[in-house]
Amino acid sequence: MQSERTITTLSEHACFGGVQGFYQHDSDETGTPMKFGVFVPRQASSKPVPVLFFLAGLTCNEETFAIKAGAQQHAALHGLMLVTPDTSPRNSGVEGADAAWDFGTAAGFYLDATESPWSKHWRMGSYVTRELRRLVLEHFKAREDRIGLFGHSMGGHGALTL
């Protein structure tokens, strides 16, 4: 078993009796620092809780759903943890990554790229389903047997294909 991976707390805020936090870690899958959000309901103080991963759409990031949807209120009521990954690697150094709004940065499509130079960093399918999933299970009271995935727009595509 691998040793526990380190995460950095960027911010944490009281939210509907739980905590909405934003974090960062160095990703093995993308080779870049990655940010993500987690809403932890109060029920997680005494037992592991079910988890829903929300995959955001084009041009979004790990904060979009957390600050715009208001889903924490409902997650708190039902004892659900919400996880919001960023939509792509950022600051990858790949030429052209920031050239268009619908390709590259903020447009990872939750797939693993197969062509160079994208394949080195754009590994969002593996990032969400392997690395971030493990990270959440290691650092938060999450139920491994109760994990769901949903999304909007590009994130809906990701939820259907993953």
Task: Give the residues covered by each predicted segment.
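Non-catalytic cap/lid and distal C-terminal segments of serine-dependent acyl enzymes
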Residues: 2-162
